[in-house]
């Protein structure tokens, strides 16, 4: 009997575009339909980043990893740990669904967007990134795309690492995975990272007083996982992690009032699951609990002072997913339930509230001759706004062997968060934000070049905005986003090249003005090679012009921010089979630029690190 992976591989095409280092079309991904499938059978553009990629790039943050990927635009209010936003294909930062091991990241706060500057890079073993609508599979938020951060380690062993760098950066990490008998595996990790940072000098955006201090970041992380195989088909796991972060930043100064310029974030997450992995049928049941407490306070008064603010969120989820091989493809179905609660006294929500959501979904994948068809439909029942349905469909045609045309259409939405509904400025009558997206793409393998080019359009309605006059949130905005994305990877002798180009025209559909903080064009290029046992890497990124607001005076003025070209250089050397040393220069030519108006970036930075494995 043919197993699922073999069958799906057999029905997949020979070679299609893959952006990351591992360019095999048979690389398995789980994010598209919640179960493993060869990447070549996923019609949506998909990128996989491995832990080996992260180590080779010597990334010290999740944002540094994501900024290298097609369609991603990262903005940040300064350096490490400072507030950041992820824009995928021009959509809002709140239109990106971030998963941790397939479970929605707990998001505290009124923005409803993921700030991955706070998520420890030490936990990341793999990232799967899908562009385009995915609400028909996952529900709310998946308008621009899905980022699935996977913490599960692939190989046993122990690693001890340490790193130092500019701005008094230091990082110490110990992780181990051990086999207990033939069927049980234990993983443990501890990580400490700290930087004094630098002065982001956000004068004008923070009131009338400049705050000449270093804006540092401290993070402490613990992780543990236990996995057990009951039989060849049945397995289970228990997993938990937590991190304790402190960030200093430049806050708005008001004479006579405490200066809330310190952020303290506590986050913990626990999940357990049971999986059945048969030859034709797969099923999994996962439950999770997460709790985050996000304080902003004046350190002279403490985080429990009446002037401090607190965002506290608890999230409970249950997921039951199933997949069965049918013909040259599969059919999947599942249900997931989520409950989010806030605690009375939370900064943006005066009283305790909860929001519950139950979703049922159906997915399908099938190959018929030279055609591949993919579809999904989902219905969500939300305690705040009732029932909402989404769907998507894609078709791929291999018109010549190794060349494929893809067309897709999908709907998606963004649910309201508790802060927007019941916060100080909340509006309980808000509707969800909605999206309709079209995409057409060609991809293939030509003379050793694995390439893909696509064009897309995204119409977003009922966007939630804030009214300065009524001091309330309301539905009124509309956005029209058009874009082109091109990716390619190829080898020339010992050199490996990976390149992408993005053109994004993201506009307010009512006023025809550009959406803020999105670069209109981006070029990204990665060059890797090995010479005399040294592993070298050069990263280039061009960020095009973008617009932002100058909040130093009212009425706020729109400002145009120029483009910039950035270069990084990284090198690694294996001293022995166990010990590797690495060095990196980020922003090699020390360019001055901003991604958020008024907030400086770090300039040239150096890091030196070493790791010992056994």
Swiss-Prot record:
**TBDR plug domain: from which residue to which, for each copy?**
38-152
Classify the protein's membrane topology as the record does: Multi-pass membrane protein
Residues recorded as binding Ca(2+) 1, renumbered to this chain, are 199, 211, 213, 215, 250
Question: What GO molecular functions are on record for this protein?
Answer: ABC-type vitamin B12 transporter activity; metal ion binding; porin activity
Q: Which key words are in the record?
A: Calcium, Cell outer membrane, Ion transport, Membrane, Metal-binding, Porin, Signal, TonB box, Transmembrane, Transmembrane beta strand, Transport
Q: What is this protein called?
A: Vitamin B12 transporter BtuB
Q: Which residues cross the membrane?
A: 158-165, 169-178, 184-195, 217-227, 232-248, 263-277, 279-296, 309-325, 328-337, 353-369, 371-381, 385-400, 403-417, 434-443, 449-458, 473-490, 494-509, 517-529, 535-550, 558-572, 585-596, 602-614
- The source's domain of life comes to Bacteria
Q: Which residues form a coiled coil?
A: none
Motif: TonB C-terminal box; annotated at: 597-614
* Function description: Involved in the active translocation of vitamin B12 (cyanocobalamin) across the outer membrane to the periplasmic space. It derives its energy for transport by interacting with the trans-periplasmic membrane protein TonB.
Pfam families recorded: Plug, TonB_dep_Rec_b-barrel
Residues reported to bind cyanocob(III)alamin: 83, 85, 92, 110-111, 251, 309, 517, 551
GO CC, alphabetical = cell outer membrane; pore complex
Q: Which residues form the signal peptide?
A: 1-20
One biological-process term from Gene Ontology?
A: monoatomic ion transport
Q: Which family does it belong to?
A: Belongs to the TonB-dependent receptor family. BtuB (TC 1.B.14.3.1) subfamily.
Q: Which residues form the TBDR beta-barrel domain?
A: 155-614
Which residue numbers does the motif TonB box cover? 26-33
Which residues are involved in binding Ca(2+) 2?
213, 215, 249-250, 261
The answer to whether the entry has keyword Cell division is no
InterPro entries, per database record? B12_transptr_BtuB, Plug_dom, Plug_dom_sf, TonB-dep_rcpt-like, TonB-dep_rcpt_b-brl, TonB_rcpt_b-brl_sf, TonB_rcpt_CS
Q: What is its main location?
A: membrane
The answer, when asked if Transport is one of the entry's keywords, is yes
């Amino acid at each position: 009997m043919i197993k699922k992976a073999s069958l799906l591989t057999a029905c997949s095409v020979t070679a299609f575009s893959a952006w990351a280092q591992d360019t095999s079309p048979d690389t398995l991904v789980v994010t598209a339909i919640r179960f493993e499938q060869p990447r070549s059978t996923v019609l949506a553009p998909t990128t996989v980043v491995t832990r080996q990629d992260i180590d080779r790039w010597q990334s010290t943050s999740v944002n540094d990893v994501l900024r290298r990927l097609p369609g991603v635009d990262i903005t940040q209010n300064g350096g490490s740990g400072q507030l950041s936003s992820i824009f995928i294909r021009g959509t809002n930062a709140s239109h990106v669904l971030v998963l941790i091991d397939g479970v929605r990241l707990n998001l505290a706060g009124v923005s409803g967007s993921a700030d991955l500057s706070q998520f420890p890079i030490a936990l990341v073993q793999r990232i799967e990134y899908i562009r385009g609508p995915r609400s028909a599979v996952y529900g709310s938020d998946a308008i621009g795309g899905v980022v699935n951060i996977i913490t599960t380690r692939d190989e046993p062993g122990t690693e001890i690492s340490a790193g130092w760098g500019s701005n008094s950066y230091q990082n110490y990490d110990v992780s181990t995975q051990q086999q207990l008998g033939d069927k049980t595996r234990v993983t443990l990790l501890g990580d400490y990272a700290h930087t004094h940072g630098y002065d982001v000098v956000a004068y004008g955006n923070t009131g009338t007083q400049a705050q000449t201090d270093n804006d540092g970041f401290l993070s402490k992380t613990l992780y543990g996982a236990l996995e057990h195989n009951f039989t060849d088909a049945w397995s289970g796991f228990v997993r938990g992690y937590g991190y304790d972060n402190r960030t200093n930043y430049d806050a708005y100064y008001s004479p006579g009032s405490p200066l809330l310029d310190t952020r303290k974030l506590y986050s913990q997450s626990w999940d357990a699951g049971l999986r059945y992995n048969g030859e034709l049928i797969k099923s999994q049941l996962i439950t999770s609990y997460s709790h985050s407490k996000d304080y902003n306070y004046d350190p002279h008064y403490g985080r429990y002072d009446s002037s401090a603010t607190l965002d506290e969120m608890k999230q409970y989820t249950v997921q039951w997913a199933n997949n069965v091989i049918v013909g040259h493809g599969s059919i999947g179905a599942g249900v997931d339930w989520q409950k989010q609660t806030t605690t009375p006294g939370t900064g943006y929500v005066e009283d305790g509230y909860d929001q519950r959501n139950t979703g049922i979904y159906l997915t399908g994948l099938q190959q018929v001759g030279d055609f591949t068809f993919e579809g999904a439909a989902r219905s969500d029942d939300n305690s705040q706004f009732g029932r909402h349905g989404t769907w998507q469909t894609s078709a791929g045609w291999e018109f010549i062997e190794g060349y494929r045309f893809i067309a897709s259409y999908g709907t998606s939405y963004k649910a309201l968060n508790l802060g927007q509904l019941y916060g100080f400025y909340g509006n309980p009558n808000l509707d969800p934000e909605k999206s309709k997206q079209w995409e057409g793409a060609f991809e293939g393998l030509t003379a050793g070049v694995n390439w893909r080019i696509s064009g897309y359009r995204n119409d977003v309605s009922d966007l939630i905005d804030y009214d300065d006059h009524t001091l309330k949130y309301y539905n009124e905005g509309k956005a029209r986003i058009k874009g082109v994305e091109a990716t390619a990877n190829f080898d020339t002798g010992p050199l490996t090249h990976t390149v992408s180009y993005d053109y994004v025209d993201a506009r307010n559909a009512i006023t025809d003005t550009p959406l803020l903080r999105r670069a209109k064009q981006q070029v990204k290029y990665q060059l890797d090679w090995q010479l005399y046992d040294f592993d070298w890497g050069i990263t280039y990124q061009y960020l095009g012009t973008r617009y932002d607001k100058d909040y130093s005076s009212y009425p706020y003025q729109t400002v145009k921010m120029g483009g910039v070209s950035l270069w990084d250089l990284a090198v690694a050397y294996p001293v022995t089979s166990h010990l590797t040393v690495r060095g990196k220069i980020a922003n090699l030519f020390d360019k001055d630029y901003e991604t958020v108006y008024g907030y400086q970036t770090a300039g040239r930075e150096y890091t030196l690190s070493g790791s010992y494995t056994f």
